[in-house]
Structures are given as structure tokens and as C-alpha cells.
Amino acid sequence: MNERSINRVELQGRVGTVRIQSIGDQMVSTFSLQTNHFYTLNDGSAKVCETAWHCICAYESEDVVTAGLTRGSLVHLEGRLRTNRYTAADGSERTFTEVIAATLRVVE
């Protein structure tokens, strides 16, 4: 199957918790990213802020270290989605989706 598909994500938001670790020769940075979506209710009565938290993983990203990525930093990133499966302590199968960052830039 050689169908063309697209798996691309572009996000800009504020950084939450940052964790940088070395796994063998590879540097891996994981952090949470908060994004907000604003909209007005259909009746126009109120503006609503919908907040989402995303799990971000950056492999060998010197940008994360050299940019001084910290909680509250505003960042812009591009990457792709990856879904992982694992077995929880209670034996149930769980899945989670994370963004694998390809490019990362600290905006402020």
C-alpha cells in the first residue's frame, strides 16, 4: 500500500512541565503544551475559552535545551501524531497520543 497520507500537526501555546533526559546517545525532551481555542456561544451570550493540553516529545532537539524552554514559555512547533499502547497496572489496555516535534521555536 503506497497511498499518500498526511500526518502533520502545528501548535502554538504555553509550556507546562518540562522533562529532559538522555537515553543512551539520544536526548529526549518531553513536555506538556497548553493551547486555547476561543469561540462565542451560538446565542452570542458569552465567549468561551476551551483549553487543551498536549503531550510533546522532541528527540535530539537541541532547540529545547539551548532555547531555555521553561514553564510558561510560548512555543511554536510542527510535528506529527503518534499513538502508543500500554498495559495499565490493572491489566487494561490503554492508548495515548503524543506529538513528535520536528521543529520547535520559542516565541517568547
Predicted regions and their residues:
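Single-stranded nucleic acid-binding surfaces, predominantly the OB-fold ssDNA-binding core
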Residues: M1-E108
